[in-house]
Amino acid sequence: MSVQVKICGLSTPETIEASVSAGADYLGFVFFSRSPRHLSYELAARLSGYVPASVPKVALTVDADDAMLDAVVEALRPDILQLHGDETPQRLVEIKARYGLTLMKAICVAQPEDPLTAAIYRDSADLLLFDAKPPKSMAGALPGGNGLVFDWSLIAGHRPETPWMLSGGLNAENVAEAVRITGAEAVDVSSGIEEGPGRKTPELIEAFIRAAKRA
């Protein structure tokens, strides 16, 4: 079975169509105002129409309150909510009860103990995403999409009960090695398919998906 691929931070019909044509398994859309990939609700609603029903839509938010999540769900009609902040297991329980959607919780990794955090979400998250934790010294760092790679050996022997996805600085050149070291069955990419902040290209998308599927 080939590695599953999530393309995150999409913002144009062209890149959505390129992702679908190349075989993306998930399409991600960002709702976080500090991100260059942030979407207005109006644009998200329009872009949603370009996504086939067979490809799950993922809405990424960061410590969003109910009012914001209501607006995101109304605009995008996502299949999955990706929670990329400091949301607690109890907050996930509340979100699940309110929307009934699949929940993906990001776990940011920099130290050996960080992957162990996944255990506290065992009963509340449907999916996990291991991403690179930005250093405190990094000016303007985002919760994700910084192009940072973490030490993949930190999760090489880590097998959480919850299905998981690998993220953090992946690109067409390093994704095969990342999969080999971690054993990841699914990968997530954003900055690694951009020619500039938030500017994805069909060519980079296709190259990444091709490399990931061959890994």
UniProtKB/Swiss-Prot annotation:
Keywords tagged on the record: Amino-acid biosynthesis, Aromatic amino acid biosynthesis, Isomerase, Tryptophan biosynthesis
Metabolic or biological pathway, per its Swiss-Prot or TrEMBL entry: Amino-acid biosynthesis; L-tryptophan biosynthesis; L-tryptophan from chorismate: step 3/5
Top EC category: isomerase
GO biological process: L-tryptophan biosynthetic process
Reaction it catalyzes: N-(5-phospho-beta-D-ribosyl)anthranilate = 1-(2-carboxyphenylamino)-1-deoxy-D-ribulose 5-phosphate
rRNA-binding in keyword set: no
Pfam families: PRAI
Catalytic activity, EC: 5.3.1.24
One GO MF term: phosphoribosylanthranilate isomerase activity
Family that this chain belongs to: Belongs to the TrpF family.
HAMAP family per the UniProt record, alphabetical: PRAI
Name by which UniProt lists this protein: N-(5'-phosphoribosyl)anthranilate isomerase
Source organism of this protein record: Parvibaculum lavamentivorans (strain DS-1 / DSM 13023 / NCIMB 13966)
Gene behind the chain: trpF
